[in-house]
UniProtKB/Swiss-Prot annotation:
TPR repeats lie at residues 35-68, 72-105, 120-153. Pfam families: TPR_1. It comes from Mesostigma viride. Essential for the assembly of the photosystem I (PSI) complex. May act as a chaperone-like factor to guide the assembly of the PSI subunits. Belongs to the Ycf3 family. NCBIfam families: PRK02603.1. InterPro entries: PSI_Ycf3_assembly, TPR-like_helical_dom_sf, TPR_rpt. This is Photosystem I assembly protein Ycf3. It is a peripheral membrane protein. The lineage of its organism: Eukaryota, Viridiplantae, Streptophyta, Mesostigmatophyceae, Mesostigmatales.
Length: 173
């Protein structure tokens, strides 16, 4: 039984019902409907922390989905799972693929920045200040891109950029 048919969560059930109605109303192919079903089941599994199941669904959705924009969200969610699992290198690969297909995906840019910032912090702990500066500058670059796309988001990143002297104000993003 598909995950979408066994949800006990009210919000997930509501989303599933609305998504099913939209799929019936909009002119979509069987392939597109199947891709969306796998994507939806992947999101549901991911929300419950069932990452292996979520990845299986996302990979199947990727196999079926041909639209680059839709694929960007699948890739982004795969990146989220790898981030949650501490697999930052893999996560970066998926985030890069997501923004390659959809350059207007600020959350992927933000997550790339977060990983570079984390690696910068690790470099400091290891006593490698030069490497930390390179990593922090990479984080700053990605945060600036994310903030340009979503100026009212990523307030902590904006503050970090100001505090560290990487921007003087929002105009210089």
């Amino acid at each position: 039984m598909p995950r979408s048919q066994k949800n006990d969560n009210f919000i997930d059930k509501t989303f599933t019902v609305v998504a099913d109605i939209i799929l019936k109303v909009l002119p979509t192919t069987v392939r597109e409907k199947a891709a969306f079903s796998y994507y939806r089941d992947g999101m549901s599994a991911q929300a419950e922390g069932e990452y292996a199941e979520a990845l299986q669904n996302y990979y199947e959705a990727m196999r079926l989905e041909i639209d680059p924009y839709d694929r960007s969200y699948i890739l982004y969610n795969i990146g989220l799972i790898h981030t949650s699992n501490g697999e930052h290198g893999k996560a970066l690969e998926y985030y890069y693929q997501a923004i390659e297909r959809n350059p207007s995906l600020p959350q992927a840019l933000n997550n790339i920045a977060v990983i570079y910032h984390y690696r910068g912090e690790q470099a400091i702990e290891e006593g490698n200040i030069a490497t930390s500066e390179i990593l922090f500058n990479q984080a700053a670059s990605y945060w600036k891109q994310a903030i340009r796309l979503a100026p009212n988001s990523y307030i902590e990143a904006q503050n970090w950029l100001k505090i560290t002297g990487r921007i003087e104000d929002n105009i210089n993003l």
